[in-house]
Amino acid sequence: MTVLAGTFDAALADRVVDGPGGFSGVDGDAAWADEVRRLLKLRGATLLAHNYQLPEIQDVADHVGDSLALSRIAAEVPEDTIVFAGVHFMAETAKILSPEKTVLIPDQRAGCSLADSITADELRAWKAEHPGAVVVSYVNTTAAVKAETDICCTSSNAVEVVASIPADREVLFCPDQFLGAHVRRITGRTNLHVWAGECHVHAGINGDELADQARAHPDAELYVHPECGCATSALYLAGEGAFPEDRVKILSTGGMLDAARETGARQVLVATEVGMLHQLRRAAPDVDFRAVNDRASCRYMKMITPAAMLRCLVEGADEVHVDPDMAAKARLSVQRMIEIGQPGGGE
């Protein structure tokens, strides 16, 4: 895309510094927010921000949500340019569902440990070991992996997707081992093979921390993302009577927001990336939301800084490209998921 020469705040843009950890040098203050909104209008662009983004990025966005919901919004909005504040696979998914639109990500180096835990070559080799198996991939995967997938799923509909597959068919579930274990536990399916991938942030929220927080806040509700390694611990605590079963909820990010709007609890413990707390507090300002692990911050999500956003809008970078043939195959796996049932609260 073209640079918006002469139409931006040069003094602000000149502060942007690139370094190993990403772009810095600009604060997400009111002047920055005004400039972002002005540049979005000049570019005819809409800004989509994931739930795990920095609060100032979420607050300036046109839409905030999970990756699949945002990608579907990208396909529906009238703007021809989409700025996706998230990690790279999310921007890829937006491009897959909106191939005719220009998709920008403020820093293309913002990767994902979960998406990177399986490659297309590894998936093809796994498929060769299980001929005839149905491949179910979490939407948190690259375009190349989606292109090798039969049906995509989100954390909110993974059980429904797997249950739709004939019981005598083997299922290869990738890449998240904890979501896969959750699906196997709920469906009781013995022919479900699970890839040993994980999100480094969710895997780092451990059962001991969860148990300590539950004991310290016995009247709280507990929202646990199924990518968490501690999801099994949460169910164990409930089963042992250490925590009331009706207060333990295994939820996608969208499911957490729905539950927050309806909860009668005064306090909620949240086991997911800490950026989610911003949206939860906006949804239910009278509830005390606390992170089970306040260090559970995704360094890749946080690479989308105010400086990165400003540089993106000034320079029209970084543009996301997906090979058309790969995108067409990947799009089919997402469409099959939608045909089975609405993806609901996404990842």
Swiss-Prot record:
Cofactor needs: [4Fe-4S] cluster
Gene3D superfamilies (alphabetical): NadA-like
This protein's UniProt keywords: 4Fe-4S, Cytoplasm, Iron, Iron-sulfur, Metal-binding, Pyridine nucleotide biosynthesis, Transferase
Entry GO CC: cytosol
Pathway connected to this protein: Cofactor biosynthesis; NAD(+) biosynthesis; quinolinate from iminoaspartate: step 1/1
Catalyzed reaction equations: iminosuccinate + dihydroxyacetone phosphate = quinolinate + phosphate + 2 H2O + H(+)
Compartments in which it is found: Cytoplasm
Entry's Gene Ontology BP terms: 'de novo' NAD biosynthetic process from L-aspartate
Binding positions (iminosuccinate): 50, 67, 138-140, 155, 225-227, 253
Key word Metal-binding present: yes
Top-level taxon: Bacteria
Functional note: Catalyzes the condensation of iminoaspartate with dihydroxyacetone phosphate to form quinolinate.
Protein name: Quinolinate synthase
Protein's organism: Mycolicibacterium gilvum (strain PYR-GCK)
Taxonomic lineage of the native organism: Bacteria, Bacillati, Actinomycetota, Actinomycetes, Mycobacteriales
